[in-house]
Amino acid sequence: MARESESGLPIEPVYGPQALRGWDPAEKLGEPGEFPYTRGVYPSMYTGRPWTMRQYAGFGTAAESNARYRQLIAHGTTGLSVAFDLPTQMGHDSDAPIAHGEVGKVGVAIDSVEDMRVLFGGIPLDRVSTSMTINAPAAPLLLLYQLVAEEQGVGADRLTGTIQNDVLKEYIARGTYIFPPKPSLRLIADTFRYCRAEIPRWNTISISGYHMAEAGASPAQEIAFTLADGIEYVRTAVAAGMDVDDFAPRLSFFFVARTTILEEVAKFRAARRIWARVMREEFGARNPKSLMLRFHTQTAGVQLTAQQPEVNLVRVAVQGLAAVLGGTQSLHTNSFDEAIALPTDRSARLALRTQQVLAYETDVTATVDPFAGSYVVERMTDDLEAAAVALMDRVEDLGGAVEAIEQGFQKGEIERNAYRIAQETDSGERVVVGVNRFRLDEEEPYEPLRVDPAIEARQAERLAELRAERDRPAVDAALAALKKAAEGDDNVLHPMKEALRARATVGEVCNALREVWGAYVPSDAF
């Protein structure tokens, strides 16, 4: 009897040659590093060097997060990933009334160039690749990073990293949007153009399925809705007059890795194949780098449990293995205590050690795409591709990703799947170790990391000092220039950078744009 995958597709008890009858390896696979990139985007993949170990971190003040980053670097991390607090993600300063109670809680508070300078103090920005998980205010945070690099004497052409900058998934699954979709897409196109000219090695967007998966999307939904968003971004940039090969090589993606190894490996392989064909056939991309779906992976936080949290170490190791077998370019392995609170120093170190064991104590880096030709994985890859393309066609029938978002299509599909998962967990049909099976009579005590509530007052004091010391007329003039650019067609990042250089805050920059573009209010808001 066939078992159902997370995407509702059959997994047979036994597979043989009949599962791949008529299957053409030249068409479906190709060679690693060659179209359609099913086997990976680079010919040697991990046989030359392992993936980038990019641990996501940030909490409290810039000084506290800086200490964590330097600790991670000392422990062997090969890339940084910045977590910002909710006020920063929403474009509010730490002393804004709406920010009360949230400053520094789920990430680091960054209000101005002063904070960004402290955040990367003692970290040479030409020697580290930095990912910033920031969306609606991605442009000002990137510009703050560039300003700090200039202070270090590092040219923008030497900076490497990624901004998430994917606002469409915020409307679908997460909610940290600021502006309506149309001006949000304009800001993203401006960022593409700015980075091509100013920061050419920077990945301008990380088109994200991770958050959809955490909200309940199946693997097929995750890649379908992510790639549909990617198509919308490409269309936006092309409509703004950019050649596809001028920006597409800097596009990147972000996916989840669950414990269901076979389906996850198939998911990553199917996503690469679909994207390569879309870019070549729909957009006429000629540069091979424009066809490559390069992606970062984070292990599935939604699968971690507060009960028996040490079991999460096992879950994360399995999830990380799935990401590696699927050909990820970089990986964050969650800390075992993240279902309870922000990671402690110890749990963050163990999370990094998990990746290091995978890279250096197993043989998964010895050969490229070890599942190639597997009856089950190739069958599942084809099935997932077909399911994802069918969902992408439904998005297209609704008028594309933005129109489908406005109609609530993606959100509704994800919510239905999330409800199914919850029902299966509640009934015991879906086994969760330590939650509905193999429970302890009494949970062992665990002391989590606690963020100092006094951080909010300290950030407010820093802001007060900043506002008292800076040249207020220069700030006002720079913000006025930003608004003028937003009202017209000029690239807003140039006046935005000058405003931030004059020590305007992130909140002031975002408020200036709110005055011109307005704020998004979802149609299903209560």
In which residue ranges do the predicted regions lie?
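Short acidic (Asp/Glu) and glycine-rich catalytic loops that position anionic groups and cofactors
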Residues: R49, D95-I98, L168-E170, S206-G209, ...
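Phosphate/diphosphate-binding loops
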Residues: D111, S129, I134-P137, A149-E151, ...
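Catalytic alpha/beta active-site cores
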Residues: M1-R258, E263-E264, E282, K289-H296, ...
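Flexible glycine/proline-rich, aromatic-decorated loop/lid segments
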Residues: D243-F247, A285-T299, Q307-N334, P343-V368, ...
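Generic, well-ordered alpha-helical scaffold segments in large soluble proteins
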Residues: F59, R68-H75, V113-I123, L144-V148, ...
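Conserved strand-to-helix beginnings and helix N-cap segments that scaffold or border functional pockets
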Residues: N66, L142-L143, A220, V265-R269, ...
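Short beta-alpha connecting loops at secondary-structure transitions
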Residues: G101-K105, K169-F179, M212-A217, F255-T260, ...
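Flexible, glycine-rich loop/tail regions that form catalytic "lids" or insertion modules at the edges
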Residues: R3-G22, E31-Y37, L86, T344-D345, ...
